[in-house]
Amino acid sequence: MNKKTIVIINNEKIFTEGKDFYCVNFDMKVLSEGLGAYSDVEFIVRKSKKKGGHKLNLENIKSASNIIKFLYFIFKTFKTKNASYLLVDITPYTFFSFLILFILRKKIFVYLRSNGHEQWRHILGLWSVWIYHVMYKIVTSNSIVMVLSERLSNKKDFYLINPSRLDDLWF
C-alpha cells in the first residue's frame, strides 16, 4: 500500500548538521514524526544557524535560507501526485506558500496552534494586527482549518483537535 504524501510547510527554523536536522520546537518534532508514521512527509522550513535541542527523525527536510528558496521548494513538491499540504500557523512564509497552492488548486490544510493576532501585536505592535488579519481571513476561507482551541477560528466549520490525533485519516 502506498502512503499518502503530506507536505508540511512551516516557519520553523531547522539547523542542519550533515544529514541530521535539529529544531527548537518540540511540538514540530512530534507533529512531523507522528505524521511520518502514516504518510510520506516532506518538511519545508527555514534554515537556522543555531542548533536546536530536538533531533528530527525525518529524511525529506528542505530548509531554505530565504523566501525565494522556500517558494522554490514548494514548486518542487508539485512533482508528487496527490500530495496534501499542511500549513502550520499563518506567517508571511506560509501565506505566500498558500497563495501558490491555492492558485494551483492543491488540497490545503491549516493548523493553528496559537492566536496569531496576539503574537503580531506583541512582536510588531498594534498597528500590524490588520496585516495578520488579512492573511488569516484569506487562508482560513480557502482551506480546511484545524485548531487547538475554539477561540482560534472564526469559521463555522473548523476541526478542534488534539495534536496527537493528527493522523492519516485527516489527509
Give each language-model segment a name.
Residues M1-K50:
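N-terminal subdomain of nucleotide-sugar transferases
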Residues K4-T5, D40-E42, K107, I144, ...:
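Residues at the starts of beta-strands that form the adenosine-phosphate
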Residues G36, F102, V139:
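Anion (oxyanion) recognition and catalysis
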Residues E42-K47, Y111-L112, L148:
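Short internal beta-strands
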Residues S48-Y72:
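A short, charged, and often flexible helix/loop element on the N-terminal side
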Residues Y72-K81:
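Short, well-structured alpha-helical segments in soluble
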Residues Y85-K106, V110-H117, E150-N154:
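An aromatic- and histidine-rich active-site surface loop
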